[in-house]
Amino acid sequence: MEKSGPSSTISEQQLQRQEGWINTKTDLAEQSLISSEKWLQLHGLKSNKLTLKQILSQIGFPHCEDYVASLGRPVASRYADGLFPQLYRAEDGRVYNLTAKSELIYQFVEHLTQAVESYKQRMDWLTSKSRQIFGVILEQCVTIVLDFGGILEGELDLCREALTMVLQEQVAHITEFNIIRVSQEPVKWQENATPVTEQSIATAISWVEKLTVELTVSEAGRLDALLEAGRDKTIESIYYFVVGDVPEESKELLLQRALEIPCPVYTVSFNARGEGTIAFLKDLSAKTHSRFHAFAERTECVEFPAFSTKDGDNVMTWNSRKLKGKLPPGAGVREDVFLVWQEMEEACSTLAQIQRLVAEPPKPDVATVDCESETTSVEIASNPEDTWDSKTWLQKYGLKAQKLSLYDVLADCSFRHADGVVDIKAKPENESVQTSAETNKKTVHAKYCSRFVHAPWKDGSLVHVNITKEKCKWYSERIHTALARIRRRIKWLQDGSQSLFGRLHNDCIYILIDTSHSMKSKLDLVKDKIIQFIQEQLKYKSKFNFVKFDGQAVAWREQLAEVNEDNLEQAQSWIRDIKIGSSTNTLSALKTAFADKETQAIYLLTDGRPDQPPETVIDQVKRFQEIPIYTISFNYNDEIANRFLKEVAALTGGEFHFYNFGCKDPTPPEAVQNEDLTLLVKEMEQGHSDLEKMQDLYSESLIMDWWYNAEKDGDSKHQKEICSMISTPEKCAKPQSDVDSTQTSSLNMLKGPWGLSDQKVQKKKVLHAESTKTSLLRSQMSSLRSSACSERKDGLSNASSRRTALSDKEMSILLAEEWLDDKSSEKVTREGSQVYDHDSSDVSSENWLKTYGLVAKKLTLMDALSVAAVPHSSTYVPVLDKHVVSKVFDEVFPLAHVCNDTNKMTLINPQGAKLNIYKRKVEQAIQSYEKRLNKIVWRALSQEEKEKLDANKPIQYLENKTVLNQALERLNWPISLKELSMLESEILAGKMYIQQAMELQEAAKKNYANKAPGEQQKLQGNPTKKTKSKRPDPLKGQKVIARCDENGFYFPGVVKKCVSRTQALVGFSYGDTKVVSTSFITPVGGAMPCPLLQVGDYVFAKIVIPKGFDFYVPAIVIALPNKHVATEKFYTVLKCNNRREFCPRSALIKISQNKYALSCSHIKSPPIPEDPEVEDVEARNSAFLFWPLKEADTQDSREPRREKPRRKKRPAKQPLQQAAPSDSDGSSHGISSHGSCQGTHPEPRTAHLHFPAAGRLGLSSHAIIATPPPRAALPCTLQATHSSKGLRSVPETL
């Protein structure tokens, strides 16, 4: 990381600002009396330039990349390619080139560590002492209104101590304050707000300690106290401290007249009995544009030894303590704590990434070049990747390495097909022996699977995919970028010495040069090729030597010479001076190369056979079989010599290359065996195939999505997308022009890679299958758009629109199918010329047509109609003495083909066949036949006859048949008349097939036009008869979790049916059946997505009750399991009651933030009944107190009994046991998490959870064992306890 680059040092001012973390702890109490939002503006990551983006901009610079419209793809700069270590930032997808040294990065690590520590201190400060009870006082002049109307006898001392802590820790740091108590008449401590002094604080504490319990408070007393506090014009805010609950009458009065209170009312709930008071105080704060805080104590106060603080003559002794409490149900997560926690999580994540830069610095793509090498060494200025073979190169830049293969891209947008085995009851075989029904197993498939595109996976299984427009566009851009890189590599390999010699893999090379007399006309070219080979490849190797051989072999050096500038220049000069010799002593040259023990590879350049028998040479080669021999032939027409050279190369593991003189392309594709090019071309072929498959899947997904969701979402969105696909197919379907050029050039190097697809197609057998429901629908939708539009204007009903007119949805699907047809036809047009240009003049037309004729290419009309044809036969009826045929296919297959010889019938639907594509293919074939016919006739003409015709290129034979036949007759027919007639017959057959296809299309149009008016008359004749289409029930039978109205929790169940668009009938697992809004229903089970959870995600957490019914509660993920420890599989979540829970991944369902807020707002908690038995249990085990829920209080439950006194008592079902978990130390007491393991923790704690009894008032308690979570997952928290003796702050033990 100490690599120097452009200057990236930080200014001293920035460093001083970041080092200011050390100086931020001055006067923490006074400094922190601000909101978390303002605090983060001062000390957050962004303000101190410590976000990941800001740090990366200071230690590096972003790699430039922009979209070039003319090229149609993103283009990245290459000026810094390999010079800098790079870091990929996943948030915005940008790549940064790092230029900073390690010392600078260590400074950022230190600053981030200090920031994390500062955030932890802030969170501890917010959740300790008076801030836990009262929140944070943000204003400088306040009035505290005390409402003790709902206080219990044992809570007065606790309230006094809590208020004392608030006065000493927070009020002492503001300017003015006052205290008012709610009573029959408001009781003021002072008439107006008093400046804060030590004496005023001591007086206020003394006044608070003298407060007593007042039994009755008038309904208007609370409003009068708040209005009285608001009359003081100097105060900025009113802090309304409510102990217990507020009567319903006072709630209504306060909410009605809340706007009369002139100041914001900050409400503080202390020990609220139910969620009603919490909701009321939230509404009151919201109406007065203020904040809300809530606290509920859990244990008694614990007295600590007293200590004194002396300031002058004033001595004050008091017990400092911390309440051990919690947030009450319905209070939600504290916003000020959550903001700091979020910032701390971001700081931890950024710190981890920056630390990785120091621990394992990113390696640059290209190693640095030492410019101070020896003077005799060769200066290497090119990219070392040029020395790689294609296999190594593809390991870095191939599709799999870039994660651009089809299965890699589909991994995050596909899911497995869901099926299962169910029991079907059936009638027993022998009823006399068995009367009960037999159980048969049947495989059923999930209903929702039909709404997704089916695709086979690489392991043979079936998956469903859903490709979005953004996904398809992203993949298209990335794959084009990757293919362009491969295309540049192919072009580089085809240029220069690589095209003849291939890639040079070994370090010690011998080059044997044939200088026999037969090489006279080729020697200059061979010299140029060898010199080019030296300059481009050989200079990167270690040692080399040259041997020229004719009658005898002469070496340039006795042994291999080192690669340096002097030797390379001398070798080039020696090669230029080579002269022509006599014979070809190949064996002597090979022996010279074999004699050098350092030889690793031999390149043999020759144009003919050796002087010695080939067997003798091969026997010598077998002795040194471990040394590869790369043979290069300069006489491709000598098959015997080339066979010998191929055998030598194959025997030693080398390769055979050749240069064909007199040919425009010196390397015909059928002879190329270059493995480097083969791998690259296959990779490009795979890339184009994957891109085409991705576009096809996207088209199917778009059509499928529209088909099912058009009525719900509207057609406009899908119509725009499909129309854009049809109007601009070149943007998403056609490869770019440079891709086409690469395909063409690749043909010259490797057996026409883009023509292989057609060869595969011709081998593929045509499958004849019966029509399915989908194919019938597709065939009906392929009618003319104009007829469909006119029929729709006639106002036909939905019942028969499938037969008489196309709906908007069907029309757009038809347009999409036609677009796909056009795309494939363009591919046929683009590739057709490559297929039919194989015009070997030495092959007879009869043999040529066996490969490229209409029958061989399956281009007869019956081949085209086979996909939309069904064989049919008549049945003889003796009564009628006739052969009759079924009319069941008349609607779908309007035409029939009867064979004259066998009278066999084939039913045909022309609309089901792609006749337009078929006609284009036949036209392409006819062009190739005409081209061959014209060339054959032209070659047969003499030069004199060509001059008579006044033409310098082949002319059309069929248009000038008479003139050309006369010329051939004058030449005594140098070519066979049979050959011409065969090609002419093939051309006429193709034109006949095109005419018949056009007639079939016209017949289909007429059949459709004749059928439509009859269907319309039927509709007009029966105007009252309407067929109501039955909409599918999407949720019927679906396993879900649904909200229960009694307590707001989510319970498992099964949807029985959808009552309406917004409501569904759910059968709960506890036996009840209720109508639930679909917004409170979450599907579970089957092939549901299971995304990775991150800190801060919102989830439903499953709460398992051994003797009750499981349910789900909303929660937030606050900690992830340790990946390095296999046994730790628990996520830590913060439930809606601000308590932690430990759950496995299977017990969590990810939800959105809106759903989390909605679920929290509907969770209810009725008051706790005052049961002596319960209070006794709580006194014995107060550390594990739960807040039970009850269906109704005593008064409410008695009223229905008075209204229906004679109602007959029926045996009631076991009611839903309403319970909410509580955990004093972060674990779940009274309930067991889904994945708790009692074997790991042998000492479980016992908690008492109370459920309302069925059919009566009161409570029944059940003791439930709850195993605490692993201790390592919990941080040490602080708890507050209380007693009659005093107030203390103690750390909570786990």
Curated annotation (Swiss-Prot):
Keywords: Cytoplasm, Disease variant, Intellectual disability, Neurodegeneration. InterPro entries: DUF4537, VWF_A, vWFA_dom_sf. It holds the Pfam family VWA_3. Residues 738-748 have a biased composition (Polar residues). Residues 508-684 form the VWFA domain. It comes from the Eukaryota. Residues 732-754, 778-803, 1012-1036, 1193-1247 are annotated as: Disordered. One of its GO terms (cellular component) is nucleoplasm. Transmembrane segments: none annotated. PANTHER family: VON WILLEBRAND FACTOR A DOMAIN-CONTAINING PROTEIN 3B. It is linked to Spinocerebellar ataxia, autosomal recessive, 22: A form of spinocerebellar ataxia, a clinically and genetically heterogeneous group of cerebellar disorders due to degeneration of the cerebellum with variable involvement of the brainstem and spinal cord. SCAR22 patients manifest variable severity of intellectual disability associated with adult-onset cerebellar ataxia. This is von Willebrand factor A domain-containing protein 3B. It comes from Homo sapiens. The lineage of its organism: Eukaryota, Metazoa, Chordata, Craniata, Vertebrata. The gene is VWA3B.
